[in-house]
Design a protein with these regions (language model features):
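Core catalytic lobe of class I
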Residues: 1-185
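S-adenosyl-L-methionine
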Residues: 187-203
Length: 203
């Protein structure tokens, strides 16, 4: 639960900075999970079990002290004044992109835009991550909260969504993944991305 995560970070000295909600399709969730709580047929039997779909959330936290490497921006003052809602300074983003990213609700996320669709070739037995993060979500987060050349840590590396996006956006990925099958797929996805970029090493 988000509340538990917030309290955990606060206990370690962080303060809650912001949250971003990302709409997820309840229909796609019902198809994927076979959850009767999301199915229309359940309203005909006993709608007391029915519930809305669950959104994704990005929680951001800050710690005390000065940010030694500011995240720079290319937004002039006139354009800045046109933005109605509070917004963080960001780097190398056009004004319309900034307005979209700073909306409280990201409605333009394609649920199929995941690392699974990125892979050019996969075998029948390749590991399938059950809940891969949409690449646009990761891209938006990197635009707001990191510079090119920064090192990005993924403590739950999964199949490499964040690591692949790091490479695509000129960041340096460090990933941690305990499940061996996910780790092998993570390496494969990084290798595929490096081939696309004609790189021979991460750095």
């Amino acid at each position: 639960l988000r509340g538990d995560l917030i309290r955990l970070f606060q206990k370690e000295g962080f303060y809650f900075h912001a949250e971003k909600m990302i709409r997820k399709s309840p229909q796609l969730a019902a198809i994927r999970t076979k959850n009767h709580q999301l199915m229309h047929g359940s309203t005909k039997k006993d709608s007391s079990i029915c519930r809305p779909g669950l959104a994704d959330y990005i929680l951001t936290f800050r710690n005390k002290g000065k940010n030694e490497v500011p995240i720079q921006n290319e937004i002039d003052f006139d354009n800045w004044c046109k933005i109605a809602e509070p917004a963080e300074y960001v780097g190398d983003i056009e004004i319309n992109t900034l307005q979209r990213i700073n909306d409280q609700l990201w409605m333009d996320i394609e649920e199929g835009d995941t690392i699974s669709s990125f892979r050019k070739a996969k075998g029948e037995k390749d590991e399938k991550h059950m809940t891969p993060t949409q690449l646009t979500v990761i891209e938006n987060s990197y635009l707001l909260w990191s510079n090119k050349g920064d090192t990005v840590l993924s403590p739950f590396g999964g199949v490499g969504s964040e690591s692949v996006t790091s490479l695509k956006m000129d960041r340096k990925p460090i990933a941690i993944e305990l499940k061996n099958s996910y780790y092998e797929m993570l390496k494969k996805n990084i290798s595929n991305q490096m081939d696309l970029m004609n790189q021979t090493s991460l750095f």
